Amino acid sequence: MSEALERLIDQGVGREPADIVLKGGRFFDLVTGELVASDIAISGERIVGTCGDYEGREEIDVTGRIVVPGFIDTHLHIESSLVTPHEFDRCVLPLGITTVVCDPHEIANVLGTEGIQYFLDSAMETVMDIRVQLSSCVPATHLETSGADLPVGRLTPFRHHPKVIGLAEFMNFPGVVNKDPVCLAKLDAFQDGHIDGHAPLLRGKELNGYLAAGIRTDHECTSAEEALEKIRKGMHILVREGSVSKDLQALMPILTERLSPYLALCTDDRNPLDIAEQGHLDNMIRTAISAGVEPLAIYRAASISAARAFGLRDRGLVAPGWRADLVIVDSLENCKAELVLSAGRRVTDALFAGRKPVEPVGLDSVKAREVKAADFGLPYNEGETSVLGVLPGKIITEHRRYRLPAEGNRTGVDLDRDIIKVAVIERHGVNGNHANGFVQGFGLKKGAIASTVGHDSHNICVVGVNDDDMALAVNRLGEIKGGFVVVHDGKVTGEIALPVAGLMSLEPYERVRDTLHHLRQAAFALGATLEEPFLQLAFLPLPVIPHLKISDRGLVDVDRFMLIG
């Protein structure tokens, strides 16, 4: 018997003092639903004792507090926080998020395997446990230009890395159902691991075929009816509440104790400003309980059910033998983390300071050609023009059709109906593609907003009222090596540089948060009415989410999975 195992047993039995003992509080038993008054003994990374009195080398008074298992975000793109994995760690771990299951899909689309390796290297050094799903759809579709291509042979060398769980969200659901050979090769290679799903509005027998391929989770449900069908068919539903995609309210009816073993929580895409102002999974928990969800249901979804869905069998309960990922909160309802333990370590500034840094990658990833105002013109169309219809708080965009006014021999914007221009410019140095269109719902009355964050291939996406400002915004992105830019009347009125693959900042998250606040104000000054104009801009080029999108190759009818202009 190893000395380490003997030590765990001795401290659990009480033969010797535990390394840490939480004294005087109660813990939330997610099996029985009870609040149990008890000391909690910890040895190294593991809980070794509950339901009794213990002595510890270090004793922490948690009188009047409640101890709950650490929270698990089951699907997110860390890149959407606009900070590096190290800064994300420092940003959300103090809120109680002790494990995240991330898909480095964004950086993989820009840098390929170099981006995945960067995330794996970072995950080995962070305090929180970052688990990585291997990006399954790079490029996401044939309807856009990506900076990389990841066939199955480039993914399999990573599959046995200690931080890898399996295959990330399989977005090309038409490819699965229609037996695309490239899709099937990836699915076949990961049949013995976890395969994450992505199946918005997929129902009936097509859903059956998708699930028959071994896919087990979905974070794209936007209605309780859709979620229930998927639960009936064996899926774990990851209830999402991000900065743009907000599905928690719609899925409240399924957040019950009965269904909680088949539910988990995720954020998908959440920026540091929202994290600072509202929180992360802790905010989801507060929101759900205030709306009438039973605490047992939502806390299960935040921990034990999430862990089981992804095969993380060592965490999710406050019980002997389980990983000491613990959050000490003031109350179940408020869910305010007062102390966090990650693998038995107190989360402090000193703990973060002791991490080994990881060198950033992709610092010269923006290779777009310089554009001119004339590049944004579209020939006048006397008939109806397809227009992307933005829905606040949703990444689904409607396919709308309008007769638009003429500006000389070009089609013009229609501010009375909130219709402005949108364009996508290829920025990986592959082909120089440039596609133009129209979008409704941003509220802009002047100026332009541009971004190198444009799911999923992360080409440049720009919306604007006049061509000169659009051109300036796009060209400025090249100068700052990626990020967000706001322009009005020929002047840059706001910007944030994201030089790591054009997706993430090298600055501390506090500075990113503050800069993003000023950037949002600059967008509002143009008339923007969306709560998250930059993240909604970033989803306009996403051709795997219905109904009409725009890529560097043109307008995409997602329902028919084809280019239409």
UniProtKB/Swiss-Prot annotation:
Stored Pfam families: Adenine_deam_C (PF13382), Amidohydro_1 (PF01979)
InterPro entries found in the cross-reference section: Adenine_deam, Adenine_deam_C, Amidohydro-rel, Metal-dep_hydrolase_composite, Metal_Hydrolase
GO BP term, example: adenine catabolic process
Reaction equations catalysed: adenine + H2O + H(+) = hypoxanthine + NH4(+)
Protein keywords: Hydrolase, Manganese
This enzyme's EC code(s): 3.5.4.2
Endpoints of the signal sequence: none
Cofactor requirements of the protein: Mn(2+)
Family, as annotated: Belongs to the metallo-dependent hydrolases superfamily. Adenine deaminase family.
GO molecular function annotations of the record: adenine deaminase activity
Name of this chain's protein: Adenine deaminase 1
